[in-house]
Amino acid sequence: KLKPVGISFHVGSQQKSLESWEKAINISSRVYKNFLKKGILMNFLNIGGGFPTYYSKYKTDIKKYSQQILESINKNFGEHKPRNIISEPGRFLVADAGIIEAEIILITQKTFKKARKWVYIDVGRYNGLAETEGEAIKYEIKASNDNKKYKYESFILAGPSCDSHDIKKKKN
């Protein structure tokens, strides 16, 4: 016989909407209270999904996030909240822990009208940059030789494969 010990949810990676957390906490509290009515006390609430992190312009105010999530837990669970509340900060803690170094392997200029320059690098969707698909995560891109004498140009950044999903940046 299985004995439930807790409730866990995942609001989605890089979730910036506090309303999504509020909704998940509200649903969890209703499930928790239904079990409580049946005499089953669960000791854990795992609020998963990870707190959003800084990739380009968005910066998480972790104090605001934590405070609003805690207020939501207190409001929805009241006096009957689980003894242990587990958070999964995820990439909020580790996103800045690494750097990907890539080399340009090809630069092309298409010949048809209104064509843009394409820059291909040796890292792509299938070897390190899967989460950039659809520009969901916009990594900061810097040249290792950031010399001011070079002019800045607009281009499409793509990985090394022929897969149409291996495009890193279209809007630059």
Question: PLM features: what roles do these ranges have?
Answer:
Residues 1-108:
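Active-site loop/helix belt of alpha/beta enzymes
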Residues 68, 80-172:
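Charged (often Lys/Glu-rich) extended helix/loop segments that serve as interaction or gating elements
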